[in-house]
Design a protein with these regions (language model features):
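Generic hydrophobic alpha-helical segments
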Residues: 65-66, 105, 177-182, 224
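Active-site His/acidic residue clusters
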Residues: 87-92, 165, 181, 189-228
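N-terminal catalytic scaffold of extracellular/periplasmic and nuclease hydrolases
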Residues: 1-125, 132-150
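Gly-rich Lys/Arg/Thr-decorated short loops/hinges at beta-loop-alpha junctions or inter-strand turns
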Residues: 45-49, 155-168, 202-207
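Phosphate/oxyanion-binding active-site loops and adjacent basic polyanion-contact surfaces
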Residues: 98, 170-178, 216-220
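Active-site regions of oxyanion-processing enzymes, predominantly non-cytosolic
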Residues: 144-146, 150-162, 177-199
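Short helix/loop capping segments that flank catalytic or ligand/cofactor-binding pockets
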Residues: 87-88, 126-128, 171, 204
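Active-site-proximal structural scaffolding
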Residues: 129, 155, 174, 217-220, ...
Length: 229
């Protein structure tokens, strides 16, 4: 955060927020969390072991906020510039004991009540006619691979959009999708919830790539500015 603030003249939209919260996401088996354990803690309110997705330390499924709110008629969205089976987005729809179980995690989309999921494609969706794509469409869940295609999907139909960033076109999926996300989820009568992740801040940190950390953080901060409007 401070690197991005320094690069941006000391200003961030995040710093304009009047209320912030603190969640301790350390796992049950270590002092330091990973994205799976932290994502599960954020999505469910319950700590677990590292590497687990939506399951407790014993491997039992834990209800996530997407499921809890959907049961009350609230519209829900999961948005990320990571792959759709990345640890953080999957914690909001999947229940698997190991974060590397990509195929099994992707298949949990078949039973997730999430109304809108936008994230980068992964191997499970390698072909437009993949088995998982066919199974989703059989459940009347639309699957598309470009944001503009969302306008063709009825507002009351669940949809998964498999699109990631395209830096060659200066296309950042979480920024470009924001207005569409709000429009679709606002169609419900009981409010909405959406989790939006800027995953590449972390990826830049792992690579010790300061430019990526700052660039991605400022991208996410622009999104925060839109949300505060």
């Amino acid at each position: 955060m401070w690197a991005a603030a320094t690069a941006n003249g000391g200003k961030l939209n995040l710093m304009q927020m009047k209320n912030i919260g603190l969640l301790k996401t350390n796992p049950t088996n270590d002092y330091t969390t990973d994205s799976a354990g932290a994502g599960t803690a954020l999505a469910t309110g319950q700590k677990t072991r590292n590497r687990r997705i939506g399951t407790d330390s014993l491997g039992n499924k834990i209800q996530n906020i997407t499921e809890a709110l959907a049961a009350k008629g609230v519209q829900t969205g999961i948005i990320s510039n990571d792959g759709i089976t990345g640890a953080t987005p999957s914690a909001y729809y999947a229940h698997q004991p190991e974060r590397d179980m990509g195929q099994e995690i992707a298949e949990d989309l078949l039973t997730s009540p999430a109304d809108l999921v936008i994230a980068a494609p992964v191997e499970a969706f390698a072909a437009n006619d993949s088995l998982l794509t066919k199974q989703l469409r059989e459940k009347n869940i639309a699957v598309c691979n470009q944001l503009p295609q969302l306008s063709q999907v009825p507002l009351n139909q669940r949809v998964i959009c498999l699109q990631g960033d395209d830096y060659g076109k200066n296309f950042r999926v979480i920024e470009e999708s924001f207005n569409t996300v709000i429009t679709r989820l606002s169609a419900g009568k009981k409010g909405f919830f959406t989790m939006i992740e800027g995953a590449k801040v972390d990826k830049g940190g792992h690579a010790n790539d300061l430019y990526t950390v700052v660039d991605e953080y400022l991208s996410f901060d622009r999104l925060v500015g839109k949300a505060l409007e």
